[in-house]
Structure formats: C-alpha cells, structure tokens
Amino acid sequence: MAIIQLGSTCVAQWSIRPQFAVRAYYPSRIESTRHQNSSSQVNCLGASKSSMFSHGSLPFLSMTGMSRNMHPPRRGSRFTVRADADYYSVLGVSKNATKAEIKSAYRKLARNYHPDVNKDPGAEEKFKEISNAYEVLSDDEKKSLYDRYGEAGLKGAAGFGNGDFSNPFDLFDSLFEGFGGGMGRGSRSRAVDGQDEYYTLILNFKEAVFGMEKEIEISRLESCGTCEGSGAKPGTKPTKCTTCGGQGQVVSAARTPLGVFQQVMTCSSCNGTGEISTPCGTCSGDGRVRKTKRISLKVPAGVDSGSRLRVRGEGNAGKRGGSPGDLFVVIEVIPDPILKRDDTNILYTCKISYIDAILGTTLKVPTVDGTVDLKVPAGTQPSTTLVMAKKGVPVLNKSNMRGDQLVRVQVEIPKRLSKEEKKLIEELADMSKNKTANSTSR
C-alpha cells in the first residue's frame, strides 16, 4: 500500500487494485510508515489495529463503483464520492437504543416503505436502505464493527465481504411472515394481476339519453376465504419447487445447425409460482373463487351502444397479492321505433298534407322531453328539415350541452281526388296560369 499526498488529501493505494479513502490530512496523527516490498503500512492513532482511520475521526469517505474485478481508473475518470450511511438516523433511533427499539423502528418503517404498499418511485430504494440498517444494527458483531469503524469496518466482517447485504425482501419475510397477503421478493415475482371482467348493460333509448343510476349484479373471481388467497390448504406450508429451484421458470436448450437455442418457459410443475403446495379444497389451489356481487352503477347522460364504463378494482381478484382487474360495463341501447339518433342529434320524420304545406300548420312532435308543438310555416317544401334547438342528446360528460332534434317534413300528394277536390284544383290551376300570363305580359 502506498500513501500519496495531494495537498490536504491522502490517497491510499493498494497494489494494482486501487481503493480510495479521502479525508483531511494530519501529519501529527501518523506515527510511522514502514516500507516493505513496494507496499506500505500506515498506523494511525485511535485504532485498535493498523488501519487507515478510526470511526471517531472525521467522516470517512469511500469511493463507490470500485469492485475487485474492475480495472484501475484511467486518467480523467470521474468518480462519485459518498459519505458513510448513518444507520441510526435511517431507523430514527439513538446509538444507545436497545434491540427491541431497533426492531420496532424497523418494523414500522418497513411496513410504510414496502414497495407493495408504497407506490412512490423512491419507496423501494428507501426500503432497501432501512433493511440494510436493520441488518447491521440487529447483529451484535456487525454493530460493534460499525460503531468502531463505520461501513469500512463491515467490509472485512465474516460473511459480509465487500459490504454486501442480504436481500431486503427475504429479511422482511423473516419478520413479517404472512403479512399483507405474502409480500416479499418471492411473492412479488409470482404476483399475478387479476383479469378484467365485462358486463353488458341494456338500456332503453331515454335511459341512454339522460343517464341513470342502476344496481347491477356481476360475477367475478374473489380471494378464497378458506386459504386467504394463497391457494394452499390451511395448516400446510408451500415448499420450493425442485424442478425450477423456486424460480418459476425453466430453460430448455436445443442444438440446431445454426447453434444452440435456449428458451425460457413457465415451469409446468409449479405453474410459475416457484412453490409446490397442498391445494386448498375450496378453490382447488387457484386462491380465488367465483362469487356474485351487487354494485351501484352511475350511467352518465349521452351514452350510446358500444360505450364502455370502467369501474376500477371491481374485476377479478389477482393471485398471490396481485392487483385486482377492472370492471368494464358495455352499453347496449334498445332503438326507439320513432326517434332515431345521429350522434347528439335526434332525427324525426313527419308527414303533412299538401294543403298544410301550402297554408302552414302546427304539429304535435314527440321528443325525449315529451310532446312539443312545432309550427310548420306556410309554403314548406317537401323534404324540408326543421330544427328544434336543444331537444337532442346531452353531450357525454357535458350534460349542460345538448344536440338538436331535426324534423324532416314529407309532403303527401294524394293519388285520388273527389270530383269536388279535382274541380277546385283545376280552378286553382287556371288561376295560376292566368297569374303567370299576366306577369309575363307586363
């Protein structure tokens, strides 16, 4: 090991695999430096054995990103320097806290920050930090090393090489067996979200136009009450699948002229769960049973055939802690025999006599709001469309806005006339010819 002084900074370098420790340089604190075969040993005050620094000195800074398998840093390389983690602050306990207090603090924080409960982006990283702190402070040997030398002291601890920590979800499972429906690394990897459920709701024309609140009965898969969703027979515990080693997947290899091809498949022995268990007699190992449930559904005004309403979380239950699916209600509207719908407009066709078309009239027109009087002006031509404003369908999710009702006028021409009617029409025709002739002569 060589000591290189850079201004007020000391850099300790070990052979060809460098590690860095940065701190303020105090020459008076170094007792002696002995050179042996191009490597050096530095003794510092305050340490029980030869080491770089004691935990009681200034904060120890270590270079991150360096591992035993990495090459020495190149010139100009950029490094991230971080301070030692304060495990006591992480758990919110004092340095004199008892094991019971440390455990209680960990349990409380782990529940709050477990990724299956807390969906914040930084929750999982915080959960790992809490687990690492508890792993150190709950172990007498590791806690003693940490109190004396900080994180650097843990790197040399037996079973704790390079500062590695246990999987935080395994640690959680050891203290919270069965908590929250089985959270942890295994259940997280095996969790299966529930599928969506679909329901067809039939409405009449007016119900679709104005909306309504209706109680419906749906059928869906719910968590089995006998096994609490685990799929295992009560009183039994699942064992690791020997086929896939608990991974839930197996790899098959096939040699071809082009090389060896590998394929990852779901383990058929455990169906991807990684565990083998005695199946529950109620749900046959699925963890779910089909049940019916009545829910109140609010249908907004303006829906039409093909509209889909989404009710979150009311679909089929998930497996092994998976999220439930959603309920999709598909609308089907029974057509009205008289009124037709065109988006937000309503179409209606009426017939009037040629006399009414000539002289004008008032009609009784059916609408979704009831029967309304419609004035047909004199001289209305065949196929004229009259507009009844705001008598149409409300705009979906904007019930204060409505379409119109469009009334198409058909003028009926009689095929047969009585003698009197024919005579009057002929007189009318003569009058029309005379009127036309007079206007032309002028």
Swiss-Prot record:
CXXCXGXG motif repeat start and end residues: 224-231, 241-248, 267-274, 280-287
Transit pept. (range): 1-82
Domain of life: Eukaryota
Principal subcellular localization: plastid
Induction: Induced by heat stress.
Subcellular location per the Swiss-Prot or TrEMBL entry: Plastid, Chloroplast
Binding site residues for Zn(2+) 1: 224, 227, 280, 283
A single BP term in Gene Ontology: protein folding
Keyword vocabulary terms for this entry: Chaperone, Chloroplast, Metal-binding, Plastid, Repeat, Transit peptide, Zinc, Zinc-finger
Residues holding Zn(2+) 2: 241, 244, 267, 270
GO cellular component: chloroplast; chloroplast envelope; chloroplast thylakoid membrane; vacuole
CDD domains named in the record: DnaJ, DnaJ_C, DnaJ_zf
Domain J: 86-150
Zinc finger intervals, CR-type: 211-292
GO molecular function list: ATP binding; heat shock protein binding; iron ion binding; unfolded protein binding; zinc ion binding
Coiled coil location: none
Primary role: May function together with HSC70 chaperone to assist protein folding and prevent protein aggregation during heat stress in the chloroplast.
Family: Belongs to the DnaJ family.
PANTHER family referenced in this protein's UniProt entry, alphabetically: CHAPERONE PROTEIN DNAJ A6, CHLOROPLASTIC, DNAJ HOMOLOG 1, MITOCHONDRIAL-RELATED
Name under which the protein is recorded: Chaperone protein dnaJ A6, chloroplastic
Lineage: Eukaryota, Viridiplantae, Streptophyta, Embryophyta, Tracheophyta
Gene, per the UniProt record: DJA6
